[in-house]
Amino acid sequence: SAYCQMAYLQQYPDRCAEVMKVVADKVKEMDVDVIVGPAMGGIVYAYELARQTGKRAIFTERVDNVMTLKRFAIHPGEKCLIAEDVVTTGISSLETKRVIEENGGICVGITCVVDRTKPEAPSPIPIVASALKLDLPNYAPEECPICKEGKLPLVHLGSRKMKQEAKQTL
């Protein structure tokens, strides 16, 4: 069917800024202190959203496959808005919310460039703004029609389990 490779948008800073303006315009009146981007996909979007809204930008990252806040601090009571590239299931956002709350912050919602959530499986955290809503099917690897054709190799492009998978190939 289709795959949203958001890194392609990041190649063009001016276009990325235009897309994030759509999101920024929707959240500029929100009471937010910090924009938090889950690594890798959310870092650029968090930075750009923070730039356009005058907020602080930070990111979470995986250490031993666990989402953590390694390089920054969240102050107790700070209102944090998560900025994602694509939200399909909301799993990365849930991990990021956990990190925010463990550090004393308050998660006020998610923003994303592309919202791929389904009505029957909504995001566990409210999506307060997106630039685009796409209704694309989600497939288990063994059910993916593109994979079945054998024209493209099945590769994992997200950051989850990357370190674990790299160890298995060494």
Language-model regions, residue ranges each:
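PRPP-associated nucleotide enzymes
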Residues: 1-170
